[in-house]
């Protein structure tokens, strides 16, 4: 448990039109360093950007930086006991090894395994492989473990094709990072 001197609470919640304002918390604790503060600021600016574009989310909270779905699962269970019926999204960026060199952002339930051979057939593409760290940084301004649907904002040339698992559309809430893997956002599909 955090003591008061270690806590700094930033309360914010964007609500849908005509709904009552309800608070949600982003807790800044003693694990938050200067670099993290800058990333948190960027994520909060991104949340403001979403509001300006009338894209609303339900909750957003800070947690230690995570580099994958398995690592993040325990934080969601701990911090989100009050939230029901959410799906943590797995975000994978792959590209064709040969041919047209198409690039894809694959979004599915974090509990699912993605079979690249089967996906290749579904997408009628050549052999698929994960994109390099360098290309990920150049294309989507991110790094492995920090990929989110929101990184498509950096794909100005629209090189990345978005592939979303249809089952996600039946979830009440989807969980994505708001451009920083130390925060998570719950948003309706």
What are these regions (language model features)?
Residues 2-189:
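Extended, low-hydrophobicity, polar/charged segments
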């Amino acid at each position: 448990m955090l003591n008061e001197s270690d806590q700094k609470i930033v309360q914010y919640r964007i609500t849908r039109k005509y709904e009552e304002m309800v608070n949600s918390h982003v807790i800044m604790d003693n694990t938050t360093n200067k670099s993290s503060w800058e990333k948190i600021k960027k994520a909060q600016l991104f949340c403001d950007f979403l509001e300006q574009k009338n894209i609303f989310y339900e909750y957003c909270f800070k947690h230690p930086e995570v580099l994958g779905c398995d690592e993040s699962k325990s934080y969601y269970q701990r911090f989100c006991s009050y939230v029901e019926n959410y799906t943590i999204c797995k975000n994978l960026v792959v590209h064709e090894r040969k041919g047209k060199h198409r690039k894809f952002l694959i979004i599915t339930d974090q509990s699912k395994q993605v079979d690249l051979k089967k996906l290749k057939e579904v997408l009628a593409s050549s052999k698929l492989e994960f994109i390099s760290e360098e290309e990920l940084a150049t294309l989507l301004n991110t790094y492995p473990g920090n990929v989110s649907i929101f990184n498509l904002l950096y794909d100005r040339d629209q090189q990345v094709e978005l592939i979303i698992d249809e089952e996600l559309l039946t979830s009440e809430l989807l969980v994505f990072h708001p451009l920083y893997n130390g925060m998570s956002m719950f948003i309706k599909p």
